[in-house]
Amino acid sequence: MLPVYGQSHFHCQGCNTYDFPTGINQTEESITPTGKKTGFDCPRCQVSLEVGTLNGGVQVCFCQNCRGYVVDNDTFGHIAITLRGNYSGADDKPTPIDPKQLDDTQTCPACLYKMDAHPYYGPGSVVIDSCIHCRLVWLDHGELGRIIRAPGPRPGNRYGR
């Protein structure tokens, strides 16, 4: 098992499994599984995505293996702004983006076109995958948490905290 860059979990490239220090519903990216399959496959693991609710409200298609998930672009923006605004914990120390992540392109689970791997254009050093055809965003486990905990102004707070 090797550590995943900038994250707190590990990945075994041999068997494509992951080891997480917390449960799926014990982070800023708390996902509650509904038990329903989607008919789409995870772009990382090629296992069937499932329906879940992110932080008790937004429905996402997620992977039980790698804990990545797909959400539409507009919903992603709303989630990031809302959760950053509500966060009151300690900021993460800034870390640079791993340039290798920009070459790690995924296939959109909906249309099967290649997604665009690019830096998230907001706080946090995160590379996200976007589909220009479907307007979907793929987030690997922990990426939304890094955006939430990134230093900088928080929406709804004129003092930046």
Predicted segment positions?
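Residues immediately within or flanking Cys/His clusters that coordinate Zn2+
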Residues: 9, 39, 60, 68, ...
